[in-house]
């Protein structure tokens, strides 16, 4: 691969990453914070705490707050041609909650905040075969076991976050590379960015679901 081909690939990935983040923002508002994938069912996803939109290096808008994407300034930035480059996301699935920052251009997450809650099965698991120990030894071993359990639980939940994002990205690519992008997504996006517009969520959902149902396995 030549240097120019590598640069071209990087630039395309940056563009796709911004479109993906814009699509997540759009769907999270249209579906009122409840998204779904075939593999994971329904879960909560919305923008929280911060969003950064830009057009080139000079025109940058940074918005912070409980729900920055819902501000008038955020939508006006889109109308001026800016696209989201970074956003804080809140993910809620099953009994778990996670917050993190999604960076569109490298398509990566950072600052993952993931409270670790051990499941009942782990808490009630039978202890290893007892051995005579002093009080300090037993306490140290218990703390070590709890630390290991918390570590593996965090790793498991981190992977679940990644899998949900990967599933959403697959859905996005299916729409982006198919006729549904022009026929359904772009018109809905245009209506969504219009201050006077109102997206027909049911019609959009039906169109996107039809497109996703025809995806090749």
Which stretches of residues belong to each language-model region?
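Intrinsically disordered, low-complexity, charge-rich terminal extensions
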Residues: 1-217
């Amino acid at each position: 691969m030549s240097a120019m081909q590598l640069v071209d690939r990087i630039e395309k990935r940056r563009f796709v990453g911004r479109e993906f983040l814009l699509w997540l923002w759009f769907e999270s508002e249209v579906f009122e914070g409840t998204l779904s994938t075939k593999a994971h069912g329904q879960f909560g996803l919305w923008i929280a705490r911060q969003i950064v939109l830009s057009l080139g290096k000079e025109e940058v808008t940074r918005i912070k707050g409980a729900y920055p994407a819902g501000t008038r300034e955020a939508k006006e930035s889109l109308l001026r041609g800016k696209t989201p480059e970074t956003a804080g996301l809140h993910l809620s699935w099953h009994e778990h909650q996670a917050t993190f920052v999604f960076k569109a251009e490298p398509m990566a997450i950072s600052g993952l905040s993931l409270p670790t809650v051990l499941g009942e099965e782990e808490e009630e698991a039978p202890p290893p075969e007892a051995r005579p120990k002093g009080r300090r030894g037993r306490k140290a071993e218990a703390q070590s076991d709890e630390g290991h359990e918390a570590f593996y639980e965090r790793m498991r939940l981190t992977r679940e976050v990644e899998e949900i994002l990967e599933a959403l990205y697959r859905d996005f690519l299916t729409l982006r590379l198919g006729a549904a992008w022009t026929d359904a997504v772009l018109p809905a996006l245009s209506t969504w960015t219009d201050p006077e517009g109102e997206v027909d969520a049911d019609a959009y959902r039906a169109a996107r679901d039809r497109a996703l149902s025809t995806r090749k396995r």
